Regions:
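N-terminus-centered regions that define maturation/targeting leaders and the start
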Residues: 1-146
Length: 146
């Protein structure tokens, strides 16, 4: 399975339009090579470099396996989980200092998950255990210019 974006290269700098310094839009994501036996997809974006521990920016699960693209500034079909701000939906990079890494992690599962909207990443990851068929990752970096 592959996860790419026309907005930035893997390990490359994310443009400011996808951050708190710009329009705070989610980037366009392209999904390919989904296993044919997958029943749902999960997308998690997090920042392991946050001073308070890993910060969850975007959590979505039960995304249909027919999803090949998530358009810029949109939420994929599926169930929205809760990010570290306590909200659902995308929250862009806004690092307090230095360069941070932002991991977009895509998982193909062998089932749909019976979890409610607003589920935390921790609870989602617990429910995903033993259900992951494939995974892909895209990493972007960002540093605020102050």
């Amino acid at each position: 399975m592959k996860l790419t974006s026309p907005a930035f290269q893997n390990n490359g700098m994310m443009p400011s339009e996808f951050t708190c310094d710009g329009s705070d839009l989610s980037p366009q994501l392209i999904i390919s090579e989904i296993p044919p036996n997958a029943k749902s997809l999960v997308l998690i974006m997090d920042d392991p470099d946050a001073p308070v521990g890993t910060w969850d920016h975007w959590v979505v699960f039960n995304i249909p396996t027919s999803t090949k693209e998530i358009s810029k500034g949109t939420e994929p079909k599926g169930t929205a989980g809760r990010n570290s701000w306590g909200r659902t939906g995308y929250g862009g990079p806004c690092p307090p200092s230095g360069t941070h890494r932002y991991f977009f992690k895509l998982y193909a599962l062998d089932t749909e998950l019976n979890l409610p909207e607003g589920t935390t990443k921790k609870d989602l990851e617990r429910a995903m255990q033993g259900r992951i068929l494939a995974q892909a990752q895209l990493m972007g970096t960002y540093k605020r210019s102050r």
